Design a protein with these regions (language model features):
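Formylglycine-dependent sulfatase
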Residues: 2-406, 421-442
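Long, internal low-complexity/basic segments
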Residues: 3, 13, 17, 34-41, ...
């Protein structure tokens, strides 16, 4: 039965006026929304590969000339404190595409292609497309993520269509990535003769010895950076030609630092301190980050901030999963106090480092200090500077600073990057900095917990654990029963202290039910060196551990404690019979030096086809002949 509603004339007029007002308000909001969408800026993101601020003249670089980037800086705003999170391409681009630190996703090891829950984690180009933007990418993806083709998130990704905005609908706002590979590390490979830039005029980092091969490598890469600068010009010229220069926010940055040895892949300033220049047309001057173009901006910016900021500039949805801070625009967020970077496996080489810094000071925690930073890495050694530097060191010609790269590391480092951009004067024990160091250590731990840092287990161990429970590493790291991060952080910190008073703690930890705790316990025993002799029986028992990561570290420690036969037998069995962590085993055999030579010689004599990468380098360094 329909209920009849009776209204007086006054009630009717009142209701009608309210309805009309609501309609007008809705119409006004609709027009405002349409106007807002109509005025949305085009965004052009120019990226170059592998160059830190060291190489650009607008940042004070003297080795080459970059007039086009310099001009962009004069027309825009030059950020002086922009830092990459990973110091190498694939983990960086994983961070960019998801708006999340790769360590939070489990995508931090180079070329790992670990899966993530794609129903939870969104890619920023998808969100821009959903909001009406035309998105294009020329032509760099390399997102290091499994479960989805990289190109799927872009409206246009075609190597033959460099200027993607030319393929949008009329009047459609665009977000275009145009990447230059001209400054990629590979451009410094091989012969370095007949360079345009003079090797004798190159300014070297203080950690590099003054060798002709190193100077030539610098000059060859300086040529590459100048070619990259010309790529930037070509793209900007195309934008001007299309009449879009004053309608487009232009962003330029590199994807990380590099490329001379000890920059790319390493979390020092030369690997992480990157250029960031933003040109904002006059029509959008209300979001200028400084009073006028040409000015420097000293705000602290992390690469993880970028995708969130781009979405904000476009007025699009920003998922809660995005972990950065909006550093530009109407919705700018408070400046963070610190930036966090991470390092894990790069190609065939295992490592694990975390770095936290502000605008001046940087604190590092080396989770694998028993390994030198300067490990042979096949791709890096294609630059003449790398083998030349290594040879110089092996001949005993390096000093305390130039030789440190090839020696085992301390557990912690701390640098004043304003006075010491090259990060060579470790101030970790300086009395005047102890309060600051303590604050930064607390901030690092807090951030690791906030991000569910997945790197506190060896790569193979965390992959295995996630697979056993049919989970992604992202999901596993958020399950405290499977991944008790606080306990791992505590265990790692205790191990890295190298305090002989912790021997009973390590011995007890070796019988823990969690292989992660056992791993950090054996690392602690390893770092105690001869102070671990009372734990020899415990280490021998660990050779039967169900975790090969624990076995390998226990065996190496026994070799160092003069129980060579016992330790080498375990390593021999793993090498001959297979292991769940073959890459770690090969790294350890290299780190062992001469102790591993008999084992490697025996193995390669029977398996000459395995003389590749690390094993081939061990053979070369120690004169092991390999039959053809």
């Amino acid at each position: 039965m329909t209920q009849r509603i009776s209204l007086s004339r006054r009630q009717f007029l009142k209701t009608a006026s309210v309805t009309a007002a609501c309609g007008l308000l809705g119409l006004r909001e609709s027009f405002a929304d349409m106007a807002g969408k109509k005025n949305r800026p085009n965004i052009l993101w120019l990226t170059s590969e592998d160059n830190s601020i060291f190489w650009l003249s607008c940042y004070g670089g003297t080795n080459c000339r970059t007039p086009n980037i310099d001009r962009l800086a004069k027309e825009g705003f030059r950020y002086t404190n922009c830092f990459d999170n990973a110091a190498v391409c694939a983990p960086t681009r994983s961070t960019w595409i998801t708006g999340m630190y790769a360590i939070s996703n489990g995508t931090q090891p180079m070329r790992s292609r670990n899966n993530i829950p794609h129903d939870v984690i969104k890619y920023y180009p998808d969100l821009l497309s959903k909001a009406g933007y035309h998105t294009s990418n020329w032509t760099k993806t390399d997102y290091n993520i499994g479960g989805r083709p990289d190109k799927e998130c872009w409206d246009l990704l075609d190597k033959n269509k460099r200027f993607g905005w030319r393929y949008r609908k009329a009047g459609q706002p665009f977000f275009a990535v145009v990447n230059s590979t001209s400054s990629h590390e590979s451009r410094a490979h091989g012969d370095a003769e007949n360079t345009h830039n003079d090797p004798n005029k190159m300014k070297l980092h203080t950690y590099h010895p003054n060798l002709p091969a190193i100077r030539k490598s610098y000059a060859k890469y300086a040529d590459a950076v100048e070619n990259m600068d010309n790529d930037i010009k070509q793209t900007l010229d195309a934008l001007k030609e299309d009449g879009l220069y004053e309608d487009t926010i232009i962003i330029y940055c590199s994807d990380h630092g590099g490329v001379m040895p000890r920059s790319k892949r390493f979390l020092y300033s030369s690997g992480t301190h990157c250029p960031l220049i933003v040109r904002i047309p006059e029509k959008y001057r209300d979001i200028w980050p400084a009073e006028r173009p040409g000015m420097a901006v000293d705000r602290l910016v992390s690469f993880v901030d970028m995708p969130k900021t781009w979405l904000s500039l476009a007025g699009t949805e920003i998922p809660k999963t995005f972990q950065g801070t909006i550093f530009l625009g109407k919705d700018i967020e408070p400046e963070p106090e610190y930036h966090l970077s991470f390092r894990e496996r790069a190609d065939e080489r295992c490592d694990c480092v975390r770095m936290i810094r502000d605008k001046r000071f940087a604190y590092y925690k080396n989770y694998m200090p028993y390994a030198p930073a300067g490990q042979y890495l096949a791709y890096l050694w294609k630059i003449q500077a790398a083998p030349a530097w290594e040879k110089h060191h092996r001949e005993g010609k390096t000093n305390e600073i130039t030789g440190r790269f090839f020696r085992p590391r301390v557990s912690e480092e701390f640098y004043d990057t304003v006075k010491d951009f090259d990060d060579v004067h470790n101030l970790i024990d300086a009395p005047e900095h102890q309060n600051r160091i303590a604050r930064m250590k607390r901030a690092m731990r807090k951030k690791q917990l906030e991000l569910y840092d997945s790197g506190l287990l060896p790569e193979s161990m965390r992959q295995r654990r996630a697979q056993e429970h049919n989970l992604t590493i992202y999901e596993m790291a958020r399950d405290p029963k499977l991944y008790p991060l606080e306990s791992y952080l505590d265990a790692a910190d205790t191990a890295l202290e190298r305090n002989s008073a912790d021997l009973p703690t390590f011995v007890k930890g070796m019988s823990h039910s969690d292989s992660g705790i056992r791993y950090w316990a054996v690392v602690g025993l390893h770092l105690l060196q001869n102070d671990a002799i009372p734990a020899v029986r415990t280490l021998e028992n660990a050779l039967l551990d169900e975790s090969d990561e624990v076995k390998i570290m226990a065996a190496w420690t026994l070799v160092k404690l003069s129980r060579k036969e016992t330790g080498l037998k375990c390593l021999r069995d793993l090498l001959n019979n297979g292991t769940t962590t073959h890459r770690l085993l090969l790294n350890v055999l290299d780190w062992m030096g001469t102790d591993a030579v008999p084992l490697v010689r025996e193995y390669l004599t029977s398996n000459p086809k395995q003389a590749k990468n690390i094993l081939a380098k061990i053979a070369q360094d120690h004169g092991i002949e390999i039959s053809k």
